[in-house]
Amino acid sequence: MAPRYILALDQGTTSSRAILFDRDANIVQVAQKEFTQIYPEPGWVEHSPNEIFDSQAQVLHECLRLARVSGNEIAAVGIANQRETTIVWEKSTGAPVYNAIVWQDRRTAAFCDQLRVDGKAHIIQEKTGLVLDAYFSGSKVRWILDNVPGARAKADAGELLFGTVDSWIVWNLSKRGTHVTDPSNASRTMMFNIHTGQWDSELLEIVGVPPSMLPEVVPSSSHLAEVHPEFFGRAVPVAGIAGDQQAATYGNACMSLGMAKNTYGTGCFLLLNTGHSPRASLNNMLTTVAWQTAGGYSYALEGSVFVGGAVVQWLRDGLGIIKDSSEMERLAGTVPDNGGVYMVPAFVGLGAPYWDQYARGTIVGLTRGTGRGHIARAATEAIALQTLDIIDAMQKDTGIALTALRVDGGASRNNMLMQFQADLTGVLVERPTVTETTALGVAYLAGLATGFWENEEELASLWKLDRCFSPSMPGDRRDELLYQWHRAVQRAAHWLEE
């Protein structure tokens, strides 16, 4: 039977998913499995590398079983992954030497501070497009090498491999046959030069990582590995890889200069397509590789919010004011406004445009009249307010005035949040019919490489609008919200600094 589907593996921060797409980019089947979050110390976040892959393999099989689809019907596999999360494993056995250190983890903040004192921040930003922060992979690799007994010696002897989650999944799907990554993931490690498209020896020396550990960097859309026949009954090409946010940008058909999307997931991630050359930021945005296709490199400006939808999980699991995430919109809608309450969810610091790793969460403006609804409303509004800070910074960097913002991710289904986002930004907020754009993006990349789809024009034609939210808030109300929000951010800033 001729291949009729692309299988996208979407390895996220809290769950692994497999999503089957047909030629019209419709979702045929979804399978999902959550995995364990490990918090060894305050500010530390880890995953089990084996559980990451095992959960991904399970949903791969479950998706095909539920869809009643055989391996012969799969044209290609695409892989999207949580970025920056760092895994180090033994080359000979494939055994991890330590848990995966997750992108949210802050244990290397002091090392990054020292690099800043040593004058390395400018070199790193100039070569990588990134700000010097514990968020990125390089300092996490160094921590493993310095703190796992014997790891540094093994790495120096060429016995250890490093990879972001995409590399780890490909390594295991290929039965240890292929050690690769793509430029979108490599550009998030703080070790990759986005101007030369190569690992950079000066950066590797700064973070103390041997080059022998690093994966080969291959185009995001290319025949880059073979899935071992054990998984599909035959060899199937892995033909698309991208970090989750770059994948979502591609899946939202933001393929042209000036188009932007925001993903409302665990964090919020706004990417603005800046075309075929990197654009340096003067306003604390990240310059990153968007993807590499047959047409060459595309770049983006990115603003990263560490805590977006995760604030909803905190209200559910930490405070217990909701029992299920689906209750959030209803509860926030029980009050007409935030009642003067502002929440800054800086649980692990503030991301763009502040990059304050010592900020911590605050709720300000509480009175005896404050209720659960006000807290829920303030949390909802905080997601959109953080996004607006990023949009304002990007417009200063580029001079590009957005006319629309495409959205995806779980929280994009919250109509109150989307309307509030439109009101704040003053532009149309467009939610697509298929909000699984992360998976769709790597399906597109894999499909392009294998001829499943012909070109990007065909892909753009497959994007369909579900709902458009138009701004309607009076300007004076918007100005008041922004003024009070920035006052609240000032209260949260530098909280842990002595």
Curated annotation (Swiss-Prot):
Q: Name one GO molecular function term.
A: ATP binding
Where is ADP bound in this sequence? 13, 17, 266, 309, 410, 414
Q: What is its EC number?
A: 2.7.1.30
Residue sites binding sn-glycerol 3-phosphate per the record: 13, 83-84, 135, 244
Record field: catalytic activity: glycerol + ATP = sn-glycerol 3-phosphate + ADP + H(+)
Q: Which Gene3D superfamilies match?
A: 3.30.420.40
Please name the pathway.
Polyol metabolism; glycerol degradation via glycerol kinase pathway; sn-glycerol 3-phosphate from glycerol: step 1/1
Q: Does the keyword Cell wall biogenesis/degradation apply?
A: no
Superkingdom per UniProt: Bacteria
Which residues take part in binding glycerol?
83-84, 135, 244-245
Query: Record-annotated residues binding ATP?
Result: 13-15, 266, 309, 313, 410
Any one GO biological process: glycerol metabolic process
- Documented activity regulation: Inhibited by fructose 1,6-bisphosphate (FBP).
Q: Which NCBIfam families does the UniProt entry name for this protein?
A: glycerol_kin (TIGR01311), PRK00047.1 (NF000756)
Outline what the protein does.
Answer: Key enzyme in the regulation of glycerol uptake and metabolism. Catalyzes the phosphorylation of glycerol to yield sn-glycerol 3-phosphate.
- Alphabetical list of HAMAP family matching this protein: Glycerol_kin
Q: Which family does it belong to?
A: Belongs to the FGGY kinase family.
PANTHER family in UniProt: GLYCEROL KINASE, SUGAR KINASE
- Name this protein carries in UniProt: Glycerol kinase
- What organism is this sequence from? Desulfovibrio desulfuricans (strain ATCC 27774 / DSM 6949 / MB)
- Gene encoding this polypeptide? glpK
